[in-house]
């Protein structure tokens, strides 16, 4: 009887453990990365769009929490259609980001992150993230 009680206590202890966000699940996060090429209209001074382009070969990073200051846990390089996906994820909060490049007034190039947040609330789910749109000035 004492052994049965110990086994039941251990079983309850293991079943009560909530696994954190990360790999080991059955859900997917997917999305796309676009570049938008713009230029400054000389007659109006406004920024006008030249064209959209799918951004292939762009790294998209994932953090297994909603904390943007943590180091990334995994990355995915977009395919020829600018698509990425992270598979085998558990329920939880996730942060995705990619880098956009920019030039300041002194012609110094620098990268800055663009963040997206998503929550997986059920197993076996496909979760789409709003597209990353990276502006490229001409």
Language model features by range: what are they?
Residues 1-4:
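Positively charged n-region of N-terminal signal peptides that target proteins for export
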Residues 24-28, 43-45:
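Short coil/turn motif common to extracellular beta-sandwich-like domains
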Residues 37-72:
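Short, ordered, surface-exposed loop/turn motifs in non-cytosolic proteins
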Residues 100-130, 137:
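Structured interaction patches on ligand/partner-binding surfaces of diverse proteins
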